[in-house]
Amino acid sequence: MHAGVTGGVHRGGKRRLRNLLLGVQLFICWVFISLAAALYLQSDKTGRTLFGTLSLEEKEQILSIPMDFSFMNAVQKQDLIHQFKNLSGVEEVLPADINYLGGVSGTGMYTEKDNKGSYVDVNVMRITSGFFRFMHIPMRSGHTPRESSDLVIDEALSHRLGTDIMGKPLYNFDGDAYTVKGVCQTFVSSVYYDSEGFIFLLSGFDDYCGHCYIKCKEGQAETVFQEVRKILKKTLPESVEVKVSTFMDDIRESQALEFKLRGIVLFFSVVVLVISLLGVYSAVTIDTEYRRKEMAIRKINGAGMRQIVWLFARLYVTLLTVTAVLGFALVEFLLRQFSTLYTVFFQHGVAFYFCLFLSASLFVALTVAFRIWQVSRVNPAEEIKRE
């Protein structure tokens, strides 16, 4: 009798330890799955927000080409751009002095001439006349710049300067005057800080061109990509690396934190999920084998499939719920810290966690149900005879 009691205590201790370890596995699983989903949702959010006047599909159809070649003069670069324009799959070409994700043409202008106290901290971009059409940026009032002395500001700067800014001059560091001719939608080039606003000035880029964007016709991006590379390889010295990417590639590179990290976290999420499911399958197998006789007696006494399932499933329902609450609490804390890095962040409310809980619980439920279904097919009379 003493040996039986000791054996029962020993088995109970092992079962509690097993359940504890399984709970730890599920907790880790919830954390990784939640973080993977969060990173994918946030990367999608930032990808859509940056230069949000363009769709994700349009960003994939725009090629981005660095042209900061010290060995080429402005005329040679213009000739290179002309070759790009002549490609059959090209819809439009947009020269720039810098990658739009890498900085701006300048900063700051004055609202009053020769008055340093009127300085306004703002991003200044040189653009061509086709910039607003290329980027699908709508005008809120006025019109796009038509003369070299015209400028356009975005809504973020308009709110800072006041609604009566239209038609008024702004001055550069040399005292040259530019007249505000229009206000466009806020230009978003970063999700890490709130924009001070943008000023857009006309330029022909005859003096300097450090970058070029090519908008491809629908379905022609890959063909144009290869043709552009051929032109660059033919034109550039062999020692210069040919670099051609898409606008979306540039965004992924600038948002490396979420775009690169999400793949790593997703991989570990899959690994942890598989390990957790194997742990659940192993645990329910041991439980069903240990309680086969009890299950047989219950079936003889009229217990249905629902009662048999609940006999084993309630432990895993409890484990799933408790570990999910703890895991989601940790993830919510991490996401709130993470969100302070961004000006925009995806919605991670109750619906986010509820969908995650349903998705992961479905895998666990199928695992448990499959094993219980296998055991429930056993003839109870034969099982009792065997015992």
Q: Where do the PLM segments sit?
A:
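Conserved transmembrane alpha-helices of multi-pass membrane proteins
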Residues: G13-L20, V24, F267, T321, ...
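"Rare, low-scoring activations can occur
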Residues: A74-E92, E155-H159, D174-R262
